[in-house]
């Protein structure tokens, strides 16, 4: 999607009433063993809606995609970030990205890249230093194109999978 095509979307924090849409998108984007549970996603939205960035399709009024993370002072991703909202540190220097969820009909158009870019800019303005994430082998190249560095195998067994740890500097 060109920048002009991004005008089709409103980029903003998630609203509580959009929780069912976020749960639906998560279940579409990830297999059951990898998806965040509806309970955990609901808790995270209630606790830190400001750590979500959504792309709402202005034509349909529906969420096309979202990105969410956990602010922390930690420098390594761990699986507990997915389930334990007590790990949220609103003043944390880093963000552990938990999911980039793009509905299938909006993929391959640059929307994921746009969300990551806007999210990084927003969090850098808050004084954050780095974004961290984990991804499967087949997504490493995509995140490298977004500017992330592959840090090797992650200390994660989420969903019974082997994950790559990746990071990108966003602030000074």
What spans do the regions from the language model cover?
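Residue-level recognition of the GNAT/N-acetyltransferase active site
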Residues: 15, 98, 103, 136
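Active-site rim helix/loop that mediates acceptor-substrate recognition in acyltransferases
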Residues: 31-59, 66-87
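Conserved GNAT acetyl-CoA-binding A-motif
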Residues: 95, 116, 122-136
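Helix-loop element at the rim of GNAT/NAT acetyltransferase active sites that forms part
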Residues: 13, 24-37
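Conserved catalytic-core motifs of GNAT/GCN5-like acyltransferases
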Residues: 71-74, 132-134, 144, 149-165
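Conserved acetyl-CoA-binding loop-helix of GNAT-fold acetyltransferases
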Residues: 102, 108-121
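Conserved acyl-donor/pantetheine-binding loop and adjacent beta-alpha core of acyl/acetyltransferases
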Residues: 62-100, 107, 157-162
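A short beta-loop-alpha structural element at the N-terminal edge
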Residues: 8-22
């Amino acid at each position: 999607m060109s920048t002009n095509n991004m005008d089709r979307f409103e980029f903003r924090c998630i609203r509580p009433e959009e929780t069912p849409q976020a749960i639906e998108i998560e279940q579409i984007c990830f297999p059951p063993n990898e998806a965040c549970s509806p309970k955990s996603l609901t808790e995270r939205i209630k606790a830190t809606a400001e750590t979500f960035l959504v792309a709402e399709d202005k034509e349909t009024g529906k969420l096309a995609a979202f990105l969410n993370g956990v602010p922390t002072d930690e420098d390594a991703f761990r699986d507990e970030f997915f389930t334990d909202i007590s790990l949220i540190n609103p003043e944390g220097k880093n963000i552990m990205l938990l999911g980039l969820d793009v509905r299938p009909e909006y993929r391959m158009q640059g929307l994921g890249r746009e969300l990551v870019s806007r999210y990084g800019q927003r969090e850098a303005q808050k004084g954050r230093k780095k974004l961290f994430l984990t991804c499967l082998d087949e997504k490493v190249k995509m995140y490298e194109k977004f500017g992330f560095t592959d840090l090797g195998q992650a200390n994660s067994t989420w969903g019974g999978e082997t994950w790559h740890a990746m990071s990108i500097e966003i602030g000074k």
